[in-house]
């Protein structure tokens, strides 16, 4: 069915605390055949700036991300599932997870909250019926979505998105050093393609997600600045770009694991000879130390 003819309620499932476990059961089945996952988050903006001396502007960008992710809470997560051809499962293909968030108690940027409210987010419902992040993390760990080498993650300018995901999965602050962040990221998300990073090799493509979608003649389903709709559009953009600019083959050595705007951004194993079990054990030790 053409995207323009699809109602968002037919393909995007709203997930709250009441239906979380039921929908995660469906995802455990879906990911077996649809292992390309486009992801987007909504979060309450940027509220602080790091102070002190920084090794470089790139180091500053990571410290900016780190201090804000540590202070703030994720509001929404969108996950869209496709196969390697960009084909969707029949029916629902996108899940929009709505997390607990309290405008009275939690920190936020007013401009960001106004934007999200104008985009249709229901903050009263987030407070009363939102998902507990710890419960979600427990279910995600055993979902077949993270910690799996065969799952490919698609994102757009996603440093903050993955920052919030690492915080959620580790239940701890982000590591002080960017290279430690990428080690942990690689454990949970072994294969990441950031569409904004891919755009560096796509002549004339520029701007944010909606601008890119317009240039690629893609039809949005749902509302902009909602995580489900944005994740769905991110997946569409990836597969259209892969076809138009990369001859349906993306060079992993050049693009996989690179996040736009963060350092070298390589979330890949440094040495293919390193035993992966030992690598994962060392990363888990880092996480354990962070939680203590």
UniProtKB/Swiss-Prot annotation:
UniProt: a divalent metal cation 1 binding residues: 40, 161
GO molecular function, one term: poly(A)-specific ribonuclease activity
Enzyme class: hydrolase
Catalysed reaction equations from the record: Exonucleolytic cleavage of poly(A) to 5'-AMP
InterPro entries reported in the protein's UniProt record: CNOT7/CNOT8/Pop2, RNase_CAF1, RNaseH-like_sf, RNaseH_sf
Keywords tagged on the record: Cytoplasm, Exonuclease, Hydrolase, Metal-binding, Nuclease, Nucleus, Repressor, RNA-binding, RNA-mediated gene silencing, Transcription, Transcription regulation, Translation regulation
Chief location category: cytoplasm
Highest taxon listed in the record's lineage: Eukaryota
The keyword Hydrolase belongs to this UniProt entry's keyword annotation: yes
Residues noted as binding a divalent metal cation 2 in the record, renumbered to the chain: 40, 42, 230
Single Gene Ontology BP annotation: nuclear-transcribed mRNA poly(A) tail shortening
Compartments where located: Cytoplasm; Nucleus
Subunit comment: Component of the CCR4-NOT complex; distinct complexes seem to exist that differ in the participation of probably mutually exclusive catalytic subunits; the complex contains two deadenylase subunits, CNOT6 or CNOT6L, and CNOT7 or CNOT8. In the complex interacts directly with CNOT1. Interacts with BTG1, BTG2 and TOB1. Interacts with BTG4.
Function description: Has 3'-5' poly(A) exoribonuclease activity for synthetic poly(A) RNA substrate. Its function seems to be partially redundant with that of CNOT7. Catalytic component of the CCR4-NOT complex which is linked to various cellular processes including bulk mRNA degradation, miRNA-mediated repression, translational repression during translational initiation and general transcription regulation. During miRNA-mediated repression the complex also seems to act as translational repressor during translational initiation. Additional complex functions may be a consequence of its influence on mRNA expression.
Protein name: CCR4-NOT transcription complex subunit 8
Organism field: Homo sapiens
């Amino acid at each position: 069915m053409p995207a323009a003819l699809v109602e968002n309620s037919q393909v995007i499932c709203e997930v709250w605390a009441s239906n979380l476990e039921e929908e995660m059961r469906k995802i455990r089945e879906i990911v077996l055949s649809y292992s390309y996952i486009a992801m987007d988050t909504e979060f309450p903006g940027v509220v602080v700036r790091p102070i002190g001396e920084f090794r470089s502007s790139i180091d500053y960008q990571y410290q900016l991300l780190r201090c804000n992710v540590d202070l703030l809470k994720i509001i929404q997560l969108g996950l869209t599932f496709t196969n390697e051809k960009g084909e969707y499962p029949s029916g629902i293909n996108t899940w929009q997870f709505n997390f607990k968030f309290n405008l009275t108690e939690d920190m936020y940027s007013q401009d960001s909250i106004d934007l999200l409210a104008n985009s249709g987010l229901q903050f009263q419902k987030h407070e009363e019926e939102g998902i507990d992040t710890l419960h979600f993390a427990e279910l995600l760990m055993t979902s077949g979505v993270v910690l799996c080498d065969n799952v490919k993650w698609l994102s757009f300018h996603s440093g903050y998105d993955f920052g919030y995901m690492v915080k959620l999965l580790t239940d701890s602050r982000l590591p002080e050093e960017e290279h430690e962040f990428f080690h942990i990221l690689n454990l949970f998300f072994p294969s990441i393609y950031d569409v904004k990073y891919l755009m560096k090799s796509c002549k004339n493509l520029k701007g944010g997600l909606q601008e890119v979608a317009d240039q690629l003649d893609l039809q949005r389903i749902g509302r902009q600045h909602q995580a489900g709709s944005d994740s769905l559009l991110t997946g569409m953009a990836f597969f259209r770009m892969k076809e138009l600019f990369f001859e349906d083959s993306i060079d992993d050595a050049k693009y996989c694991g690179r996040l736009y705007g963060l350092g070298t951004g390589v979330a890949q194993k440094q040495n293919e000879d390193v035993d992966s079990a030992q690598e994962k054990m060392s990363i888990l030790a880092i996480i354990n130390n962070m939680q203590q």
